[in-house]
Structure formats: structure tokens, C-alpha cells
Amino acid sequence: MKKIVILFILMVTLQTLSAQKYGYLNKEELYKSIPEYDSATVQVDKLRNEYENMLASMQGEYSSKTTSLNNESATISDYLRQTRQDELKNLSVRIQLFSVRANAQLEDKKNQLLQPIITRVDNAIKAVATEQGFIFVIDSGQMLFTDEKKCTNILPLVKANLGVK
């Protein structure tokens, strides 16, 4: 009787293990197929370029003023030299503050534009995985190897759920 119970438990365990379903998809590829994602990344890139141009302009001004001060240092009064050095310090602080604030605003804009898309994608993945009975789904963009014979690519199913091609 004891052997029969052990055999039964072993059979149930093996049956349960063989019935498990695994899914995978490339999340980056999925994002790129969503038109709103492209639009959001274009907006973020445009803002990033604006900030980079402004920062480059400020750094150019700093470099120009530094060169000018170095060239005139021997011919100007101590008071004027000190005044220009103070201006350079203030400009340096402004550059640093601008850089920090620009990065924070860029991150906020990125989150504002992309978070709804990320949430929508995550919800679609969960819906498809639950509907199809997958026990877990792997992002194949993060994996070194995926045995495609033992798991299912759910990218087409998730795209259909999202209504994208």
C-alpha cells in the first residue's frame, strides 16, 4: 500500500511538472511596435537635445570667459580680475544646477510619457499569460538562451491584445 501511495504521488508530481507552460517575448521589440512609444521617445529625444544644446552653449560661454580672463589677467586690476573670477564661479554653479535640473526634468518627462505605455504592455502580458495558462513569461531580450521548443513566443498574442502589428 505504501508503494502505491508513493507511486501515485510521483505520477501526480510528474504530471504537474509536464503540464507547466512557459512563455517568452522580446519586450523591447514589443515597445518598438507600439506607435505611442515611438512618439514618446521622439519627444524625450527632442527635449534631451534642447537641454544638451543649452548646456553646450553655457559651457562655451564659460570657456570663452575663462580664456578671456586668462588673456587679460596681466593687464587688468585685481578688483576686475576678482569680479570676473566670481562671475566664472557663478556661471559654473549655474551650469551644474542646470545639468541636475535638466536631468531631473528629462527623467520626469520620460516617466510621464512612457509609464502609461509600460503599464499597458505589462497588463497585456499578464492578461495573455493568464488566459493561455503560462506559469511565467521571460523577456527574451534579457536571456542568453531560450529553448524555443520548450516554451512559446507570446509576442504575437500580446501584440494582438494591444491591437498593434
Predicted feature residues:
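Amphipathic, charged alpha-helical segments and their helix-to-coil junctions
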Residues: Q20-K165
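Bacterial Sec-dependent N-terminal signal peptides
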Residues: M1-Y22
